Amino acid sequence: MSNEEQRSRTDGRQPVGTVVFDFDGTISLGDGPVRSYARHAFARLPAGLRERAVRTLDLYLGGAVTDDGRHWNDGYDVVSDMCAGHVPADGLQQAYLSSRDELARGLVHVDMPQGLPGFLDDLGSLGCVRVLLTNSPLHGVRETVGRFGLEGRFDLIVDGAGKPGRWGDHIAAFDRLSGRGRLLSIGDHWDNDIAPVLAAG
């Protein structure tokens, strides 16, 4: 695992297993981050296409069937699709990084699930290793964790995780960390967060 922040366990107990949390859409809730990304990305589109892109994203995030009839995994897929052929990959990456900077600065509104701090405390009391595993960069994640009052409640934070492709590496590392072959993954994206763990047994 790379790009990780780790807090050592100080109670001396043998961990009983690992509980892995995703970040966006799991402990950080709301459309603010993807709307921020869209605002920066769509600004690079011609005016007519920009209006259509904004309308399509609004429909998708509102749960309506889009006028294109497409199916996306999340709002980020919508933004990328609407920009295809008009905004190069480096332009989309810059838009994404700008949105994460706004998240880090507290300019994007997000919420956490009710009761999350207590839940993490309970997991720690049970001897679980609590991991935050995200494909997002640390910038934006770290600051949000702090604003949520979750500092010290994760034993390990791994950013730039490369899910789903690198799950095998992560599972092996978590098994070494906990000394157990028990892992629970909690996330909002089936392909990224759930299916690879089920497939690994």
List each language-model region with its residue ranges:
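Substrate-recognition "cap/lid" segment bordering the active-site pocket of phosphatases
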Residues: V131-L184
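Acidic, divalent-metal-coordinating active-site segment for phosphoryl/phosphodiester hydrolysis
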Residues: D188-A200
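A metal-dependent, Asp-based hydrolase signature
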Residues: R55-R105, Q114-S125
